[in-house]
């Protein structure tokens, strides 16, 4: 059986690349019954050797082979690559727009093409544009959603052949709890006071991630507690050339002024770590930052899963998140504070990924941050008792699907990798 995954190259630093790596690591355990190929796109030439392709997986660098050069996705190469590999199953993993473009470039026809087409769909907002939904519905044989919530939302678009759930998980070989002495050393290197309560937002600097809400909420937290040792670390792309949406330093200064705070006194309580190219944040470095931070924050107005929050919590940190729905698949009030919605805003008609997004106030963000400090010890205890799913657990049924699709025999067995 020949299986082809079309997704972000593992030699990247995004959440997509982490998930791709773990999916490939799991499916590689099915060798020799399953021969796995990876059409890996958007590999950044300046960020080589971030992580290795799992043993036994045959990978193709779509960005390097594009001709002519486009966006690094390899749309002009996917059709000939599929014909060359001759797979039994192709699974595309990305957002609806990218999925649609691959489907169109592959020229797949359900029931006529020689392979089955599966979609691992990243949904972040409700109300995906109808042309994208129709393309996915008309061409795919099976769709995997990140959670039961997103499966339910997706089924509201109409009738689909087969919709299932494939969650995310934490890789314990990469992320782990560090002893206090090591954490103290990391905080010293970051110039974080030993008595500080450190918040962390490690999300991309895009409009959807709403880092402005984090900054405004933190400024209001400082206004309520001007003498407390509260600090915020934001690990993100800060350079406009790398696609950064917010000018984080200017936003924070503006919010401090708006709260009547002395800028010189409080601006130093924000630490920015720029992950823009050519800077490289390895998984090991991110694990150190996770461990050095007391509480995680995500103020996104739309989220597919929230892998940063799951990873950070795995190292022992409670979370503060916007109530966008998807977090309820792995977070509860024992380990997280949920920032309530106060309305919605509609997107421009050209927005393909959704019709609207929930809105949140900076005051509510400050409330969540303040409450997380007040309940920090209780939440830490709850996190220590939390049962985390492994990649082998979340991929178990998916691997069964792969074997069942490729094998004529009635029974198959799966040996999964922890």
Predicted regions: what they are:
Residues 1-47, 85, 392, 396, ...:
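N-terminal subdomain of nucleotide-sugar transferases
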Residues 176-192:
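A short helix/loop element that forms part of the nucleotide-sugar donor recognition site in Leloir-type
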């Amino acid at each position: 059986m020949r299986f082809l995954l079309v997704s972000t190259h593992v030699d990247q630093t995004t959440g997509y690349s982490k998930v791709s790596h773990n999916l490939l690591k799991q499916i590689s355990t099915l060798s020799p019954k399953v021969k796995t190929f990876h059409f890996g796109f958007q590999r950044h030439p300046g960020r080589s050797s971030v992580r290795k392709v799992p043993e036994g997986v045959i990978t193709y660098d779509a960005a390097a082979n594009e001709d002519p050069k486009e966006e690094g996705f390899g749309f002009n190469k996917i059709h000939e690559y599929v014909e060359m590999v001759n797979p039994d199953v192709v699974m595309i993993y990305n957002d609806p727009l990218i999925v649609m473009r691959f489907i169109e470039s592959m020229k797949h026809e359900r029931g006529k093409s020689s392979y089955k087409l599966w979609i691992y769909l990243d949904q972040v907002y409700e109300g995906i544009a109808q042309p994208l939904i129709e393309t996915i519905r008309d061409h795919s044989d099976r769709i995997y959603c990140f959670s039961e919530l997103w499966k339910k939302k997706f089924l509201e678009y109409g009738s689909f052949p087969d919709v299932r759930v494939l969650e995310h998980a934490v890789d314990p070989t990469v992320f782990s709890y560090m002893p206090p002495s090591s954490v103290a050393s990391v905080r010293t290197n970051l110039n974080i006071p030993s008595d500080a309560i450190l918040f962390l937002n490690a999300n991309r600097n895009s409009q959807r991630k709403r880092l402005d809400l984090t900054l405004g909420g933190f400024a209001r937290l400082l206004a309520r507690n001007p003498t407390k040792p509260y600090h915020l670390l934001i690990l993100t792309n800060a350079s406009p050339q790398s696609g950064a949406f917010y000018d984080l330093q200017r936003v924070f200064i503006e919010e401090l002024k708006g709260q009547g705070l002395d800028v010189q006194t409080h601006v130093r309580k924000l630490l920015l770590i720029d992950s823009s190219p050519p800077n490289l944040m390895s998984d090991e470095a991110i694990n150190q930052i996770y461990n050095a931070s007391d509480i995680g924050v995500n103020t996104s107005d739309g989220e597919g899963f929230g892998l940063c929050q799951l990873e950070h919590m795995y190292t022992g940190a409670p979370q503060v998140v916007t109530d966008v729905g998807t977090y309820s698949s792995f977070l509860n009030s024992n380990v997280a504070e949920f920032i309530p919605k106060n309305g919605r805003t509609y997107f421009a008609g050209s927005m393909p990924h959704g019709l609207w997004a929930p809105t949140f106030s900076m005051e509510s963000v400050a409330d969540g941050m303040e409450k997380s400090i007040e309940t920090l010890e209780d939440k830490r205890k709850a996190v220590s008792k939390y049962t985390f799913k492994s990649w082998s657990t979340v991929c178990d049924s998916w691997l069964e699907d792969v074997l069942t699709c490729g094998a004529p025999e009635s029974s198959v067995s799966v040996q999964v990798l922890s």
